[in-house]
């Protein structure tokens, strides 16, 4: 029996809420589609801004209490809001008890896991993974890794996407052009591989106007310090930086010791072309499956090719601009937006709810009927969109 194939769902979502967050993009997409979303924001329980050593130490000491607060809040919302879907983006503070509270009321729990490793983000997240009704992973190797590590088979690959509200060509004034304009940019968190490639690029093209945006670049050696902007950029500023750079370099994260593979596709793979930027992407079979080389983006496979491609496209404005336009068209026409990804999540939730409804008693199934007056989200006042 179909489970309300057209009716909006009640969704309890765990996500960060800063503008430009991949997690918050899902929340806004669900709301645009007419679903009722109650939000449990990660930052309500553990402030990510606590970056100094004393504050990090305090957070470690408080962590058991933070987890208890997060679990209590989820259990409370499960009882009061009665969600059809518990949507968790990563969920480092989501416990098995929180998931079971939703499932006990007949709801479905779905996780969207964006990282290469399932075991490097705390014990709570790893313990919770087997409890979900379904896991979407942005890595093609993710389902096999979940089965090998946890015996989980209810998982599938779902790539990142672009947020149509954020990742789009964005108007800039002169100060924006001064701040973000450059020959080439890299936007992303530091890693040894990324540093090595950018050092090689600057050795080959020492006069290149390069700008590096992102976190942890203070760990880089002295040869890149002149190019590091010493801060991450988010939301509209991120889109501006993409649009202002002549060449946007997309380097894949190599993964860490506990990951079975490094990235083959990332969120930036979609953000850059959707924002109207020219993308020079590290070559992989997965990026090639989404964007055609030399039509929708350019690609490189080693430091020498990276330098050669940067040099070539800086000298060929027409080719660079044509590829940027084709890349945006490809992103818009190929189902790469967060709205498309969110529809996949909703379709899976409906299928799981329908399967569950066939096995539950009518008295339990009836708790899912949406009253006509149920329009607003249930939750703390801070959950409202601004």
Region spans (language model):
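C-terminal alpha-helical cap of glycosyltransferases
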Residues: 338-386
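Active-site proximal beta-strand in glycosyltransferases
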Residues: 101-116, 134
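Short hydrophobic patches on amphipathic alpha-helices
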Residues: 78-79, 129, 242, 310
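Proline-aspartate-enriched helix->loop->beta-strand connector
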Residues: 78-86
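A charged, aromatic-enriched C-terminal amphipathic alpha-helix characteristic of glycosyltransferases
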Residues: 315-347
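Nucleotide-sugar donor-binding catalytic core of glycosyltransferases
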Residues: 2-56, 67-73, 89-90, 96, ...
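Conserved acidic donor-binding segment of nucleotide-sugar-dependent glycosyltransferases
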Residues: 297-303, 313-317
């Amino acid at each position: 029996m179909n489970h309300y194939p057209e009716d909006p769902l009640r969704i309890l979502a765990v996500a960060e809420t800063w503008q430009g967050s991949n997690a918050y993009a899902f929340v806004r997409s669900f709301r645009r589609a007419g679903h009722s979303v109650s939000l449990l924001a990660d930052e309500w329980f553990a402030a990510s801004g606590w970056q100094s050593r004393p504050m990090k130490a305090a957070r470690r000491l408080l962590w058991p209490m933070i987890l208890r607060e997060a679990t209590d809040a989820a259990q409370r919302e499960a009882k009061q809001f009665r969600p059809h879907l518990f949507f968790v983006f990563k969920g480092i503070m989501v416990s098995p008890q929180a998931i079971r509270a939703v499932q006990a009321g007949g709801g479905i729990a779905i996780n969207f896991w964006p990282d290469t490793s399932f075991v490097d983000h705390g014990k709570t997240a790893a313990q919770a993974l087997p409890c979900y009704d379904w896991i979407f992973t942005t890595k093609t190797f993710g389902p096999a890794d979940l089965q090998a590590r946890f015996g989980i088979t209810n998982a599938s690959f779902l790539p990142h996407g672009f947020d149509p509200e954020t990742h789009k060509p964005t108007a800039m004034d002169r100060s924006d052009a001064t701040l973000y304009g450059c020959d080439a940019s890299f936007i992303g968190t530091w890693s040894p591989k990324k540093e090595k490639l950018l050092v090689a690029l600057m050795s080959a093209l020492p006069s290149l106007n390069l700008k590096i945006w992102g976190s942890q670049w203070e760990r880089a050696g002295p040869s890149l310090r002149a190019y590091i902007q010493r801060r991450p950029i988010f939301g509209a500023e991120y889109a501006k930086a993409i649009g202002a750079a002549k060449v946007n370099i997309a380097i894949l994260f190599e993964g860490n010791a506990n990951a079975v593979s490094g990235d083959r596709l990332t969120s930036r793979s979609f953000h850059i072309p959707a924002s109207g930027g020219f993308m020079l992407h590290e070559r992989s079979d997965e990026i090639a499956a989404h964007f055609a080389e030399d039509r929708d983006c350019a690609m490189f496979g080693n430091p020498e090719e990276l330098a050669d491609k940067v040099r070539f496209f800086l000298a060929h404005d027409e080719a660079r601009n044509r590829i940027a336009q084709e890349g945006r068209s490809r992103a818009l026409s190929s189902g790469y937006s967060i709205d498309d990804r969110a529809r996949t999540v909703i379709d899976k939730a409906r299928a799981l709810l329908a399967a569950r409804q066939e096995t539950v008693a009518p008295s339990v199934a009836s708790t899912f009927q949406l009253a006509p007056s149920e329009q607003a989200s249930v939750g703390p006042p801070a959950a409202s969109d601004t």
